């Protein structure tokens, strides 16, 4: 009797361990992963705070946004190669947003994570919104959709990705 109880307990433990492992998300990463963070005026609360979350495109237009909002808002950035679907993106958002209150959050995430399907991307989108809302419940949110590539010498070669971008933006 005791032996059968022990076997039963071991079987439940093994089943539970396998079940938990099956639900573990394996990130689909690029060959090189990167993160770039800029948090200016962290000890100053005279102006509203804006956070730009995105990739290298966001990092590219950050200086212009910062210049346009000079004297009106402090502009911070979290730019990363992480994509929706990668739990590390949510961790990065939580970390950066823990540094202070943000009044507006502008986010654009879509040109990385090609290994994630559109269904995986769609399923992960609410998690990003929840993370932003958890850290900045009263912030205004701006979602910048990913711009499809429609012209240029690479257009034909990128046709499949452009179709995926359009689907992700819907």
Give the label of every model feature segment.
Residues 1-3, 68, 88-170:
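Alpha-helical cap/lid subdomain in secreted, periplasmic
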Residues 1-52, 58-74, 94, 98-100, ...:
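N-terminal secretory targeting modules
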Residues 48-52, 78-82, 112-118, 156:
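Second-shell loop/turn segments in exported
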Residues 56-57, 69, 79, 145-147:
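A mature extracytoplasmic/lumenal domain signature
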Residues 57-58, 111:
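Short, glycine/acidic-enriched loop or turn micro-motifs at the edges of active sites
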Residues 59, 84, 150:
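Flexible, glycine-rich phosphate/dinucleotide-binding loops
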Residues 72-88:
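A short beta-strand-loop structural module common to alpha/beta enzyme folds
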């Amino acid at each position: 009797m005791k032996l059968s109880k022990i076997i039963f307990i071991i079987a439940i433990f093994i089943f539970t361990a396998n079940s938990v492992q099956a639900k573990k998300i394996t990130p689909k990463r690029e060959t090189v992963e990167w993160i770039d963070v800029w948090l200016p005026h962290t000890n100053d609360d005279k102006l509203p705070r804006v956070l730009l979350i995105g990739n290298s495109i966001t990092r590219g237009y950050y200086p212009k946004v910062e210049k346009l909002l000079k004297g009106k808002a402090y502009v911070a950035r979290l730019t990363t190669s992480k994509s929706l679907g990668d739990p590390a993106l949510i961790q990065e958002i939580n970390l950066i947003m823990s540094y202070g209150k943000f009044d507006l959050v502008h986010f654009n995430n879509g040109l990385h994570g090609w290994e994630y399907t559109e269904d995986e991307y769609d399923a992960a989108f609410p998690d990003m919104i929840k993370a932003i809302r958890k850290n900045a419940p009263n912030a205004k949110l701006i979602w910048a959709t990913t711009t499809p590539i429609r012209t240029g010498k690479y257009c034909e070669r990128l046709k499949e990705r452009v179709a995926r971008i359009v689907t992700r933006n819907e």
